[in-house]
Amino acid sequence: LVHHPYVLKMKQYPHHCETSCYQHCLNVAYFNYRICKFFGLDARSAARAGMLHDLFLYDWRGHRKKTGDPVHAMTHPHTALHNAKKYFKLNKLEEEMILKHMFPVTPVPPMHKETWIITLTDKYCGTCEIGRYYYHVWFPRGAYYFVKRLVKKVFGSDYEYQDYHLPFGRISEDTADNEVN
């Protein structure tokens, strides 16, 4: 599925900031598989639907101007399902997962647990992809540098605290010290 020429075309289209549509779908497929397998659900269908849930093959940012489609978020599940059915044999669960992955933006709620999971993993992956982009925009030298600079401003330049605990990594203290001083 991931090597199908039609699926590989998703690499050409940006999706969330710098993440391609292909990478986003791969992320969703991975988390769908892991979560559904953990709960003893249909992990294979979850992974397949995750890989195909955004198979719309256009840059959605300019789509409205070109087509007049007012709300991409509400219409792209139908486009993705149409494209997926054209190239792949889908079961009913995979169809539902692709069609309802945008709930609550799309009005019909999911019927199966796997569909609820793709709804949540899609939001989670999208949030992480956007957050990762803006983290690098807002903190180009890393959050460690930002926190160390903030601590020095608040507590004074002579304050020495060796461990700034950050959930998203850190740079070496020598590098940060050179950038702050």
Regions found by a protein language model. Name each.
Residues 1-181:
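Metal-dependent phosphohydrolase cores
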